[in-house]
């Protein structure tokens, strides 16, 4: 959950998000190093006179050709590794289908019989004390902690996007097309997200709430919901 005046990322709650935060820090260090080098060279040019030999030197041309290539490699390798990790879905313990509508989400637990529900935002007038405005829903997505979860995402009308920042998940929901993503929650808790694709007048009223619980609690919840 983001805090007021927060500048950094939310606390990572999945291995993918942890990797994304580390890559952000890595890229930021590289960018700061480049900025420092450029500022140093600018200051040196302003304070010192340049000779024609320095401008036309082959060594300088070689350096400013090789250095950008090294920088690109330093950024590309970890980026490609994370991209492959985000696309890899290996034997999930649970498959969840998320369907975007104007303006709510429908969920189907395909591994269970008759376990599906619609998830609407709770209006501000009905919101209990201590809950978050425009983020709470009447039915949360409950998943077992530390288990691979596959999410199949589509839409029933227009473009939507299923996004939960603290899990490092953001996948477009496209009518007539099935996209998929996966995540593993590393701790129990409640994680908030929203539709991240402009989808109409009430686009900002499509929150997503994922609740991560230990496996026994998830089994009890699924049994209760299936029997009701």
From Swiss-Prot:
Top-level enzyme category: translocase
GO biological process: ATP synthesis coupled electron transport
Keyword Methyltransferase among UniProt keywords: no
First and last residue of the signal peptide: none
Residues exposed to the Mitochondrial intermembrane side: 1-14, 87-228
Residues annotated to bind Mg(2+): 197
Known cofactor(s): Cu cation
Compartment(s) where it occurs, according to its Swiss-Prot or TrEMBL record: Mitochondrion inner membrane
Catalytic reactions on record: 4 Fe(II)-[cytochrome c] + O2 + 8 H(+)(in) = 4 Fe(III)-[cytochrome c] + 2 H2O + 4 H(+)(out)
Membrane topology field: Multi-pass membrane protein
Pfam families linked: COX2, COX2_TM
Residue ranges crossing the lipid bilayer per the database entry: 15-45, 59-86
E.C. code: 7.1.1.9
Keywords noted in UniProt: Copper, Electron transport, Magnesium, Membrane, Metal-binding, Mitochondrion, Mitochondrion inner membrane, Respiratory chain, Translocase, Transmembrane, Transmembrane helix, Transport
Binding positions for Cu cation A2 per the UniProt entry: 195, 197, 199, 203
Record note on cofactor: Binds a dinuclear copper A center per subunit.
Family: Belongs to the cytochrome c oxidase subunit 2 family.
NCBIfam families per the UniProt record, alphabetical: CoxB
Protein name: Cytochrome c oxidase subunit 2
Source organism phylogeny: Eukaryota, Metazoa, Chordata, Craniata, Vertebrata
UniProt gene name: MT-CO2
